[in-house]
């Protein structure tokens, strides 16, 4: 940011929740940096919308920085029903510009109406009640408690991502395959997705 001061625009882009370990971005500190260096803030809420925050409205809610974030992106394929597609929203002047200049927006197909309808209904449900969010976080706590009691190493997190650390790429792959045989969808991650020392499903 210091080196970019001569540039016309500066932007800090971050995930709200980092998918490999469930760490939550410190949005209060990021927004302070942006204000100090006159930069825009863009946050990808793909793993945080519907999950993080007192009512599941994402990291902007968690850190109370709604008016300090300029651009939000997210997916409709996770907390909002597991469908497809995504969204970009934010300050009006930025969105108006993106509607004219964003090649992925201009040259792609629209999301199917049924997916739009289901996603809008999910947004409405989350806005009207925190019951789904509360149930999710209770399930996460239960899962973590039982896995830790069974002797597994799970990284602490404020999100719903529970990284089970196995520290061996082959074991990670075998573990994930066995879980899928049992009807439980698990993905094993290992180098280069993770540091060489920390493969996990």
Predicted stretch roles:
Residues 134-182:
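Conserved PLP-binding catalytic core of the aspartate aminotransferase-like
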Residues 196-201:
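Conserved small/polar residues in nucleotide/adenosyl-binding loops
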Residues 80-147, 152-155:
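PLP-dependent aminotransferase class I/II
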Residues 55, 61-97:
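Active-site PLP attachment segment
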Residues 20, 49-50:
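Catalytic P-loop NTPase motifs of RecA-like helicase/translocase cores
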Residues 19, 120-124, 159-167:
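A short beta-alpha structural unit
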Residues 1-43:
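Active-site phosphate-binding strand-loop segment of PLP-dependent enzymes
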């Amino acid at each position: 940011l210091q080196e970019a001061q001569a540039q016309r625009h500066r932007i800090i882009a971050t995930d709200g929740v980092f998918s490999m370990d469930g760490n939550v971005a410190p949005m209060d500190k990021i927004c302070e940096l942006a204000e100090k260096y006159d930069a825009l803030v863009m946050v990808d809420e793909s793993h945080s919308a519907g999950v993080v925050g007192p009512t599941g409205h994402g990291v902007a809610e968690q850190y109370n920085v709604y008016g300090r974030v300029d651009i939000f992106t997210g997916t409709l394929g996770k907390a909002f029903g597991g469908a497809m597609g995504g969204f970009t929203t934010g300050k009006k002047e930025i969105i108006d510009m993106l509607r004219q200049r964003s090649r992925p927006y201009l040259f792609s197909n629209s999301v199917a109406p049924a997916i739009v309808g289901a996603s809008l209904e999910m947004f409405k449900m989350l806005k009207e009640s925190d019951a789904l969010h509360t149930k999710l976080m209770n399930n996460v706590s239960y899962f973590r408690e039982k896995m830790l009691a069974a002797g597994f190493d799970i990284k602490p997190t404020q999100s719903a991502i529970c990284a089970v650390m196995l520290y061996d790429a082959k074991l990670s792959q075998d573990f994930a395959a066995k879980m899928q045989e049992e009807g439980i969808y698990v993905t094993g991650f290992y180098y280069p997705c993770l540091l060489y020392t920390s493969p996990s499903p």
